[in-house]
Amino acid sequence: MRPGRPLAGFYATLRRSFRRMSKRSKNKAKKERVPVEDRPPTPMPTSQRLIRRNALGGGVRPDAEDCIQRFHPLEPALGVSTKNFDLLSLRCELGWCG
């Protein structure tokens, strides 16, 4: 703000700019919006994937998560589908992997 300009003038300018912004219609705002649907989904980090994705629906037990990270470290990185990853985490949960 310039020296010597009263604060009331600043607030008047602020009010005018808010009034101009509120006159933008909802349709115009929708047209200006960048569509997100065309963008590919952000890949989830492996640590979160282990917690969220398993056949039992909850988190993977710590010993099973340790088993997945120690004995199957490349499988999530190679693009294992979520169904196969669920089966892998279930095998580790039940102690069937060897």
From Swiss-Prot:
Listed Basic residues bias regions: 19-31
Region spans: Disordered: 19-47
Top-level lineage group: Viruses
Family: Belongs to the lymphocryptovirus BNLF2b family.
Protein known as: Uncharacterized protein BNLF2b
Species lineage: Viruses, Duplodnaviria, Heunggongvirae, Peploviricota, Herviviricetes
